[in-house]
């Protein structure tokens, strides 16, 4: 999934003319805090998101010679259609579990981080947690 999409996108980006910065493109993958704090019952999910996180640096190093940057965002608990399908009290409890701000993340906050990553040419090979300092318990 993520690796093959990145591979195909990188091939297309490498064929582009470079910008003044010598850059040809930016790949931003989505990992998850589960890559770092997987819970009981999440082994497969944590492993898949851990794979996304762990391929970020070597992919960035490999694609650097072509002017393609690779980054990943590891979001915490965000307001998504899936979460909004949960009962209100569950949504509130999930939001309250975030140290600060104590609420669900807003997809616009994810988008703002992605835009910053695109604009900041020095960002490369990083996985950025976007989770309000949340660390998931094993449960």
Feature map (PLM): residue ranges:
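C-terminal substrate-recognition "lid" of short-chain dehydrogenase/reductases
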Residues: 106-130, 135
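Catalytic Tyr-x(3-8)-Lys segment
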Residues: 89-109
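Short, small/polar-rich loop/turn modules that mediate ligand/substrate recognition or access, typified
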Residues: 64, 69, 123-126
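Residue(s) in the substrate-gating loop at a strand-loop-helix junction
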Residues: 32
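Short, flexible catalytic-loop segment of classical short-chain dehydrogenase/reductase
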Residues: 74-85
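Active-site loop immediately N-terminal to the catalytic Tyr-X3-Lys motif
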Residues: 37-43, 65-66
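Active-site helix of classical SDR
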Residues: 6, 48, 56
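Alpha-helical segment proximal to the catalytic Tyr-Lys
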Residues: 11, 61-62
């Amino acid at each position: 999934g993520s690796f093959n999409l990145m591979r195909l996108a990188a091939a297309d980006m490498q064929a582009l003319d470079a910008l003044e910065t010598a850059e040809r493109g930016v790949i931003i993958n989505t990992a998850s805090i589960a890559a770092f704090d997987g819970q009981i019952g999440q082994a497969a999910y944590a492993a898949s998101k851990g794979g996304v996180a762990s391929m970020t640096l070597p992919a960035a190093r490999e694609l650097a010679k072509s002017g393609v940057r690779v980054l990943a965002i590891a979001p915490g608990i965000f307001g998504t259609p899936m979460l909004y399908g949960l009962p209100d009290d569950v949504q509130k409890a999930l939001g309250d579990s975030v140290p600060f701000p104590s609420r669900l993340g807003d997809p616009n906050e994810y988008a703002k981080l992605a835009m910053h990553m695109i604009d900041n040419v020095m960002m490369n090979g990083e996985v950025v947690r976007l989770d309000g300092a949340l660390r998931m318990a094993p449960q």
